[in-house]
Amino acid sequence: MIDVVEIQKILPHRYPFLLIDRVCELETGKSVYAYKNITIAEQIFEGHFPGHPIYPGVMIIEGMAQAGGILAFKSAEDPSGLSIENKVVYFMSIDRAKFRNPVKPGDKLEYRLEVLKHKGNVWVLDGKAYVDDKLVAEAELKAMIVDK
């Protein structure tokens, strides 16, 4: 398990754009399971939408990307010993994104990503997001680890 303090040592994101609360499972080079608790206090709900708060799909995709970034970094560290101190993960593309159900305040948004392909510093991931085991979004993500 990786808590938010450790996550901040891996990712450069900070409030209000750090979209992972905890990593529950991580199998290096293979998969990651992480989540974010969605609350009405999220800054995004001031405008999306007043009186009918819906967590934006682009934020769900970004949360998937952050979980994928953690997976890529932790996989690159182990067993190669690569230092991630001066590295960053750049999001390269999103393919086949679909939004299936709305995400609302009070939901526990779960991210499950699996590595489809990894070559050098490029990662292709199958990302899915769930609330109460119900699929809310999915996409194929591509990212690259580069020097800062």
Swiss-Prot record:
Catalytic-site annotation from UniProt: 48
CDD domains: FabZ
InterPro entries (UniProt xref): FabA_FabZ, FabZ, HotDog_dom_sf
Keywords from the UniProt entry: Cytoplasm, Lipid A biosynthesis, Lipid biosynthesis, Lipid metabolism, Lyase
Catalysis: reaction(s): a (3R)-hydroxyacyl-[ACP] = a (2E)-enoyl-[ACP] + H2O
Superkingdom of origin organism: Bacteria
Keyword Lyase: yes
Uppermost EC category: lyase
TM ranges: none
Enzyme Commission identifier(s): 4.2.1.59
MF annotations from Gene Ontology: (3R)-hydroxyacyl-[acyl-carrier-protein] dehydratase activity
Cell compartments where the protein resides: Cytoplasm
Functional description taken from the UniProt entry: Involved in unsaturated fatty acids biosynthesis. Catalyzes the dehydration of short chain beta-hydroxyacyl-ACPs and long chain saturated and unsaturated beta-hydroxyacyl-ACPs.
Protein name: 3-hydroxyacyl-[acyl-carrier-protein] dehydratase FabZ
Native source organism of the sequence: Campylobacter fetus subsp. fetus (strain 82-40)
